[in-house]
Amino acid sequence: NLIKHSLLELANKNISIEKVHLFGGATSHSDVYEWKHASEIVKYGIHNFYSKKDSVLKYLYKTFELGDNPIGLNPISSNSKNIKNYDVSDTVKGHFEYKKNLQTILKNL
């Protein structure tokens, strides 16, 4: 939630940024309006990397957020051309594997 709310605050103040990379994010994927609004201030896009094999998000996030689905497990729901989703499930098998696989993930963009 922190990243999304920070982007929304920047959007409300008309402050733009270059690019955003999200890895295993623990915020809702389905806030379509909020994600579209947040993406409008990011010049080179919001890049969401998610893994369907992230058991931390699969069990803990869903338990504490009453079944909601996080962006770390799913694509961000948005029709914005400025939001790109990448399924890295073949490379990232768990929540703590993003850092060690970062070079591979970014090389395959």
Q: Over which residues does each language-model region extend?
A:
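Serine-dependent carboxylesterase/thioesterase catalytic core
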Residues: 1-71
